[in-house]
A protein has these predicted regions:
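Beta-strand repeat architectures
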Residues: 350-356
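Alpha-helical, heptad-rich or low-complexity scaffold/stalk segments
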Residues: 392-393, 402-404
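PEST-like low-complexity, intrinsically disordered acidic/proline/serine-rich tracts
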Residues: 1-344, 356-358, 362-368, 380, ...
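A short, surface-exposed loop/turn module that caps and links secondary-structure elements
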Residues: 369-375
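Ser/Thr- and Asn-enriched, surface-exposed coil loops between beta-strands
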Residues: 375-380, 401
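Residues on the solvent-exposed faces and adjacent turns
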Residues: 385
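Residue-level recognition of beta-strand termini and adjacent short loop/turns
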Residues: 247, 351, 399-401
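Extended lipid/amphipathic-ligand handling interfaces
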Residues: 374, 395-397
Length: 424
């Protein structure tokens, strides 16, 4: 059998967003991203390398000065080297995730997670309100095999007739037979499914079925993944992986996910990894003592039993024409492939060149809380949605009567256009 043993590091591709022009590519008033661009030019790639090297130098100097926090910023501990590809998805060719089926979107809205969607008011009453990654059970597939920003060790080991994929995150191991062995009956389901391998020349091909329908297909450890960790899977999920050793230093990895219950089409991710013979795989403790689920639940119950009054929103001074244009209800839908999430706002013209505003609610339920940190500078509007995971909006009241901008949080940033819904 071909020798593909290696100590690989997924973090080397962790700067590459999942979708083309996604994640941190969105900025308010930034130049539009080129959706046709799958690869950086030589000049662009060299400039990305220059900026990355400069950040590494800053991190190295910080480490020498004893500033541990600053030294961990980039490149020194996690070698997230710029890549030439602009996105991880190579199929569909547009570099975007396929749309979810109606059933997929219905299931997405039922999923639990400790990551809030824009405007969502999360509550926790038990383990079922969290996903499997929150609970340190598994990231599932294909999530486990996506490049992410920390604990990215991926060791490939071999024995006669077997290949072992050993992962640093969640310290999982997949033992993959490459010869004919007895198949699992279809009624037996596993978190990471049932894998079978075969060789096509020097390429290892692994097909995996028999999944438990409890894992998100993707999660937020991947730059540019859909927010909220609401990406369901079904028992009909099938994952196909291809691994080939290109030379002594570089391995090419590809993974395809198809799930007719959830996805309207399959999608494929491909990226290179470098072999690092000195890579040490430390213990992955997840959250120490597995206490986070209990703490979240206890805190959520306490906060609901003892609600903190919302601070009063001071009226915000604006011009008369802006007050008139904003007055009324607005609805916007950020681009989130997994859910159709409508966000409804209400601005009130106080009649004295000031306005107030609140979040009426979202598709997930009514909120009726004042917008936080509301500022209006000319026609530029900024505010924070009042929920557990702060989402900050920055946009502009346009000449065509819409409110266009970006809503962003630690999960990434999303373009959104709010349109008038009901005039007062």
């Amino acid at each position: 059998e071909p020798d593909i043993r290696a100590k690989l590091d997924m973090m080397q591709a962790s700067r590459v967003p999942l979708e083309r022009c996604s994640g941190y590519s969105y900025r308010f008033n930034a130049p539009p991203c080129d959706m046709s661009k799958a690869w950086l030019t030589e000049e662009e790639y060299n400039e990305a390398l220059r900026r990355w090297s400069s950040n590494v130098d800053v991190s190295r100097q910080a480490l020498q000065e004893g500033n541990i926090a600053l030294s961990l910023r980039t490149g020194l501990v996690d070698p997230n080297v710029p890549q030439r590809q602009t996105n991880l998805i190579v199929d569909p060719p547009n570099g975007l995730l396929p749309a979810l089926t109606p059933e997929g979107k219905r299931l997405a809205l039922q999923m639990g997670s400790d990551w809030a969607l824009p405007g969502e008011d999360l509550t926790f009453d038990g383990p079922e309100d969290f996903d499997n990654w929150d609970r340190c059970i598994t990231r599932g597939l294909p999530s486990s095999m996506m490049p992410y920003r920390y604990n990215g060790g991926f060791f490939i080991e071999q024995a006669p007739g077997y290949v072992i994929f050993r992962l640093e995150m969640i310290h999982e191991a997949r033992i993959i037979p490459t010869t004919d062995v007895e198949e699992l009956p279809p009624e037996i389901k596993q978190y990471l499914g049932h894998s079978r391998g075969r060789w096509e020349g020097t390429t290892l091909v692994v097909e995996t079925t028999n999944f438990k329908a409890t894992n998100p297909l993707l999660n937020l450890a991947v730059v540019g993944a859909p927010p909220g960790n609401r990406f369901p899977s079904s028992e009909q999920l099938k994952v196909t992986e291809r691994v080939v050793r290109l030379n002594d230093d570089t391995w090419l990895y590809e993974i395809t996910a198809e799930d007719p219950v959830i996805l309207t089409a399959p999608f494929t991710v491909r990226y290179p990894m470098r072999h690092n013979p000195d890579y040490l795989m430390p213990e992955y403790a997840c959250h120490e003592g597995n206490t986070i689920v209990r703490y979240y639940t206890e805190t959520s119950r306490y906060e609901r039993a003892n609600p903190t009054p919302e601070p009063e929103q001071a009226p915000v001074a604006v011009s008369a024409d802006v007050a008139k244009a904003l007055n009324g209800r607005w609805v916007g839908r950020p681009r989130i492939v997994t859910v159709d999430l409508d966000i409804e706002l209400e601005f009130t013209d106080n009649g004295d060149n000031t306005v107030n505003a609140k979040l009426i609610g979202t598709t997930l339920g009514e909120i009726n809380k004042p917008l936080r940190d509301l500022t209006i500078d000319g026609r530029v509007v900024r505010f924070t949605l009042p929920n557990i995971d702060p989402w900050r909006f920055q946009g502009e009241l346009t000449a065509d009567g819409t409110l266009q901008g970006i809503v962003a949080s630690a999960q990434g940033s999303l373009p959104v256009t709010f349109r008038p819904l009901k005039r007062k």
